[in-house]
């Protein structure tokens, strides 16, 4: 809250990112005091359950999924009902987030149960129609059962499975979350929002195509190098400790990991599109091409798609492309603007 306390101030509600797997609103990088002081706005942030504790889903059971989204919705409801006590205007609330936090903003735009609690939205480097941001109910069940199996819990009865999980320490559950992803992949997370027919009533792409979303002003944006951060966590040939010069062999090995559900035709199409055929063995170009594929597929194209759909239905849409590398960025130069 700015000092002196304002009257009827604009409110900004922040949702942190972290792949729906980790994070907290109390990190120094999310300190809202600077924004509040500079702009005279009230800045609110929240915590929400992440990982299996927030997004495990057994469709048809007492744990249908999306608990983390309901946490966010409850926070929005509280802000709507109480922010006037802090000098805020409940009719001037902007919801904003980054990465998975940005992908979290989208379901509130899509859900009629959340739409009344905010007026505008900002989505930074993520949206719900990205390939990593949701799963269908069948895949959600498979992941829940895989986690249960990794913890030695029964999987043939939902109630027994859940009772077994309830009895496990949270740290033990979290330690086994990575066991549910069956194929080597880049930019994928074990427990994410599920298309449950309630909070997310249909595929996000279908909802965007049909215009089933809050009609409002939208600001969206991406960074120049959206993919590089994720490459240093296991992509063949990549590391933050060297220049990550990528051979043709590593280039070809990376692509199925970037599109783990892709068939042979789609993989071949990606190779065709992103190969410099006059310099197939240029290690710098191969490195940059892989970074482009990861960023385009997982962030830039989905965000552009959402912006396009919103504009098609007559909404005011604003878009930014962030191209300025911070002088104090700790990552190597090859990772660019992240």
From Swiss-Prot:
Residue pairs linked by disulfide bridges in the UniProt entry: 153-164
Keywords carried by this UniProt record: Cell membrane, Disulfide bond, Glycoprotein, Hydrolase, Membrane, Neurotransmitter degradation, Secreted, Serine esterase, Synapse
Subcellular localization: Synapse; Secreted; Cell membrane
Glycosylation sites: 8
EC class: hydrolase
Domain of life: Eukaryota
Mode of membrane association: Peripheral membrane protein
Pfam families according to UniProt: COesterase
Annotated GO MF terms: acetylcholinesterase activity
Chief site of localization: other
Assigned protein family: Belongs to the type-B carboxylesterase/lipase family.
Reported function: Terminates signal transduction at the neuromuscular junction by rapid hydrolysis of the acetylcholine released into the synaptic cleft.
Protein's recorded name: Acetylcholinesterase
Organism name: Myxine glutinosa (Atlantic hagfish)
Native organism taxonomy: Eukaryota, Metazoa, Chordata, Craniata, Vertebrata
Gene behind the chain: ache
